[in-house]
């Protein structure tokens, strides 16, 4: 989702633009964090817990760090796990993911003030580690506005400051060695691939791609991005299938659920799925275009995991959450999306499947088709090799294989967690997209304001999946498989989260001395 295409309640386009530059101008102090975030209606936008404020800071960090989608999911999970583990020390039953009940404080210390302080130190340490770009501009000012010293590195576990620092330190120590390569110690550069992935096809230059040598496999693209730089795609997160999950046993655990995988070149299904996307492209309505843009969550955004973390903020305000409620809900939500990233990227790596932009240009080269012709051009006749998805020319297709849809997996997983948490699929949220607010067809699309409304979490997740078909990013099979995968991952993550909530998790305890 691009930040300046949305009006939600009383949050206007100017506020959305401010949000992007806020970190540079030190505007993201706590009272303004939610006001500058889309998706959260003004009527329910006042911060209701310190965790919501830190979640807002984390989302700004994701935007400014410009990291890949699975890395964003991991970052949010790390931050919320650090906060959960710190909070657990002040709960009667809950245990942390790393130190279990070793940090538990006596009943007389289980105050709101102690919880908030411990959570804030944990969040600050986590954000400075996983999303350091905004440490000076966002996280330190928020700590100071809350009345805490960001330079206090105490590890005295008889204090909430020490609890926060120690609990977070244990989580970070674990995640520094989870095979994501955050530290760049497995291969040069943070999050770089250490698994020796190599694409089957040579890169194709956009907007005139050459046919793929192997139309069953992903083809990297070469294009000019929003900064004017020439980009040659590499598989972002090629190693992600090996990352240590939260609840799954391994990245491939649920792969059988998405078999037999994508359609094969030469099959009727392969031809049919391409024709379906061409037909969608030729008949795009303003509503479909704006659904595609609203859910796109591309560069400079909070990414799909952050989009659902914002929806969770709406749920928090709608349901009048306590701090304890927020800690537990966001812990389950973000860790489910972490596992969704691992499961989806396992399928992407295993099937290495072709994107529509490659499949269609290869199949219909030399054949006249009718499709969207580019910004403001409507539907035109073109050679099939000229087909492009309804996307910004500066980011025509994401840098990884097609099957399964990441958007579908994240969204189905998040929707399932929010349903399980609230006990109902009811969502009741909406956003209004202003006339002419399109980033792809500015001032032209939509002709009139368009309101997207979701009665249920499932409806929102399904629309997110469908948006990638409207946008020419995914075929139907990848969308539906992603939805199925996301629900399976969420059910497993939810069950695992309960063992931390009720203290029944009995896996081995980490050494407290080492954590300090």
Q: Which ranges hold each PLM region?
A:
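N-terminal secretory signal peptides that target proteins for export/translocation
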Residues: 1-22
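N-terminal export leaders
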Residues: 23-28
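Hydrophobic helical h-region of N-terminal Sec-dependent signal peptides
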Residues: 29-34
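C-terminal segment of classical bacterial N-terminal signal peptides
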Residues: 36-42
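Acidic/polar surface patches and capping/hinge elements
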Residues: 43-516
């Amino acid at each position: 989702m691009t930040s300046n295409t949305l009006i939600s309640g009383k949050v206007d386009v100017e506020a959305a633009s401010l949000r992007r530059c806020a970190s540079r101008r030190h505007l993201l102090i706590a009272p303004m964090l939610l006001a500058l975030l889309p998706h959260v209606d003004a009527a329910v936008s006042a911060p209701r817990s310190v965790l919501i404020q830190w979640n807002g800071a984390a989302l700004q960090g994701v935007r400014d760090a410009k990291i890949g989608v699975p890395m964003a999911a991991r970052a949010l999970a790390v931050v919320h796990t650090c906060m959960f583990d710190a909070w657990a020390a002040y709960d009667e039953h809950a245990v942390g993911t790393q130190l279990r009940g070793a940090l538990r404080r006596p009943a007389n210390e289980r105050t709101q003030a102690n919880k908030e302080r411990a959570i804030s130190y944990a969040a600050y340490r986590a954000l400075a580690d996983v999303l350091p770009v905004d440490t000076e501009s966002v996280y330190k000012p928020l700590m100071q506005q809350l009345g805490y010293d960001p330079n206090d590195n105490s590890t005295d576990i008889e204090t909430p400051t020490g609890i926060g620092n120690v609990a977070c330190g244990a989580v970070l120590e674990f995640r520094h060695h989870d095979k994501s390569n955050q530290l760049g110690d497995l291969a040069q550069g943070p999050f770089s691939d250490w698994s020796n992935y190599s694409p089957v096809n040579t890169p194709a230059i956009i907007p005139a791609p050459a046919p793929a040598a192997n139309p069953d496999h992903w083809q990297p693209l070469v294009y000019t991005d929003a900064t004017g730089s020439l980009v040659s795609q590499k598989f972002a997160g090629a190693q992600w299938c090996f990352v240590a999950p939260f609840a799954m046993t391994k990245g491939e655990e649920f792969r059988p659920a998405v078999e037999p995988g994508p359609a094969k070149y030469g099959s009727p299904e392969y031809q049919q799925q391409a024709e379906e996307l061409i037909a969608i492209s030729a008949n795009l309505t303003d509503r479909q275009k704006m659904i595609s843009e609203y859910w796109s969550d591309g560069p400079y955004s909070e990414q799909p995991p952050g989009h659902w973390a914002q929806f969770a903020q709406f749920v928090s305000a709608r349901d009048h959450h306590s701090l304890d409620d927020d800690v537990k809900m966001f812990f389950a939500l973000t860790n489910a999306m972490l596992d969704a990233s691992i499961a989806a990227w396992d399928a992407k790596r295993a099937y290495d499947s072709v994107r529509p932009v490659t499949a269609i240009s290869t199949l219909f080269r030399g054949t006249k088709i009718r499709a969207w012709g580019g910004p403001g051009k409507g539907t035109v006749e073109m050679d099939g090799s000229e087909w492009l998805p309804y996307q910004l020319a500066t980011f025509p297709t994401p840098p990884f294989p097609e099957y399964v849809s990441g958007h579908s997996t994240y969204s189905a997983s998040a929707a399932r967690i929010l349903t399980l948490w609230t006990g109902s699929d009811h969502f009741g949220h909406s956003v209004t997209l202003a006339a002419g607010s399109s980033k792809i067809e500015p001032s032209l699309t939509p002709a009139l304001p368009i309101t997207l409304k979701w009665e249920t979490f499932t409806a929102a997740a399904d629309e997110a999946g469908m948006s990638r078909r409207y946008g020419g990013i995914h075929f139907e099979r990848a969308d539906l498989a992603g939805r199925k995968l996301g629900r399976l991952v969420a059910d497993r993550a939810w069950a695992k989260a309960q063992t931390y909530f009720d203290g029944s998790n009995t896996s081995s305890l980490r050494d407290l001395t080492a954590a300090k």
